[in-house]
């Protein structure tokens, strides 16, 4: 495994871990971790997952990105797009990859980022989302969540203590899940992570929804969702299948 800086912003290095397949000039999977945009790390990819991808002939590049609410969602999306551009433009000479064969895979928030960032890049050949969000405009995202309200209520004072003055590029679920839980319980998750008001900034939010951005020019898209996912509705993903 090799750790590489794919981008520097405001003096902060954004890193990715590169896991090489045995064959040179192999296709590459860019893996994007989840965490509600608030926590997570490139290191969270399962080693068994990496092993299976490598054995199937794929290099793997698992990336960090800046985290919310210290960084807003539009900048997070730009980080992911910059990682994809780096893989296409810079990585071939360094890592023996095939730049014409790039796939993007992510889970949960990472699945959302994979769908949104990967669907508009011509050099991306496939996007795979595991329970990623297709639409962040609904009440499920901008109103208090019945699912998360069943859990211990997080006080505002505790949530405020979890916000830093620094840019974060990785954080464990133990460190920051309380902040995510607070936002979901208060119905402020979208407002805090995007900096947009769900009522007043509908057009800006529309542009942050994968179901509004995917078209016939997009690469092959696969979105997997469990039948018992309770945190957000599955039905908005059916638009792709039926559209």
Model-derived segments and spans:
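A fold-wide structural signal in alpha/beta-hydrolase
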Residues: 28, 54-61
